[in-house]
């Protein structure tokens, strides 16, 4: 069974991810057998619908279209993270987010959703998008999870607290396991009580970013208040952790378990976290999960020193 990985981010780590995809094609001997980069998820700044992580700044039209094309030309779909928990139905009219949908809707690219009204809106107006049920929903109840599979989601991203709970995972019917996506390196503390609040703070910060003028987004005019201030000041030490500081968590999925127990059970979609993490952290996660041990030093160095062509 092929292991399918979903990697971060189409904007922050665009060049790194394109380099990774090309390296897998050019040097398959560096990597574990039967792996695939099945999508690259994220969003463009400063999209109001974006959730999970806050993203400020400005993306030009040419940057957006060239990014989508670069991934699609490599047979990798982009996957918008439209999971802002603060959205209301009024936000469905957002011009920029609708434009992002219009230029990416080709039956190949995907959307991650968590709000029913946004999901319904997308189904009506952009029906070609395969939809992914977000981990932001924080579903830990088995019956509630089974309800998700009754919908036509391409994949359902499990709450990370399901990780390594093999008694619960074994209850998921075999025929549904290929539609399960597992977040294998969660930085959140297991069963974090503030996770919902953190998502909401990030969502409010994203809303503030989307309201900035173009001059503020370009940095030509200083904002009265940094729209990212609340997100940056949220008291969560995990946001400063490196990859190896989370490997002791009960919810961390080891590479041995990915290629052993999980694939053996029929789970083959794996999400790697890291949208706004530093480049070295993201590289380390790729090296750990994708690269054969004897090539890890070489691949790590090549990724760290790679300079994209202008």
Regions found by a protein language model. Give the residues of each.
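Active-site pocket-lining/capping segments in soluble small-molecule metabolic enzymes
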Residues: 1-144, 153-310
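Solvent-exposed alpha-helices and their adjacent loops that cap or buttress functional pockets
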Residues: 148-150
């Amino acid at each position: 069974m092929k292991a399918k990985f979903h990697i971060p981010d189409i904007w922050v780590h665009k060049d790194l991810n394109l380099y990774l995809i090309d390296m897998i094609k050019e040097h398959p001997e560096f990597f574990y057998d039967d792996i695939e980069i099945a999508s690259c998820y994220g969003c463009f700044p400063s999209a109001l619908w974006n959730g999970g992580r806050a993203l400020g700044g400005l993306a030009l039209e040419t940057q957006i279209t060239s990014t989508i094309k670069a991934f699609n030309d490599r047979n990798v779909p982009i996957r918008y993270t439209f999971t802002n928990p603060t959205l209301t139905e009024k936000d469905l009219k957002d011009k920029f987010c609708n434009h992002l949908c219009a230029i990416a809707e080709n039956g190949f690219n995907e959307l991650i959703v968590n709000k029913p009204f946004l999901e319904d809106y997308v189904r009506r107006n952009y029906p070609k998008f395969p939809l992914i049920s977000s981990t932001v929903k924080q579903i830990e109840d088995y019956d509630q999870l089974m309800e998700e599979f009754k919908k036509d989601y391409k994949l359902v991203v499990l709450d990370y607290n399901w990780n390594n709970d093999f008694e619960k995972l074994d209850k998921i019917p075999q025929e549904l396991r290929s539609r399960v996506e597992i977040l294998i390196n969660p930085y959140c503390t297991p069963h974090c009580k503030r996770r919902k609040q953190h998502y909401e703070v990030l969502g409010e910060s994203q809303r503030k970013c989307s309201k900035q003028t173009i001059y503020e987004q370009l940095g030509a005019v200083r904002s009265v208040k940094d729209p990212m201030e609340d997100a940056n000041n949220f008291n969560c030490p995990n946001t400063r952790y490196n990859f190896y500081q989370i490997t002791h968590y009960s919810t961390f999925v080891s590479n041995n378990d990915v290629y052993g127990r999980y694939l053996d059970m029929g789970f083959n979609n794996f999400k790697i976290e890291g949208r706004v993490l530093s480049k070295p952290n993201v590289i380390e996660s790729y090296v750990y999960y994708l690269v054969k041990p004897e090539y890890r030093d070489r691949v790590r160095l090549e990724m760290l020193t790679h300079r994209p062509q202008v």
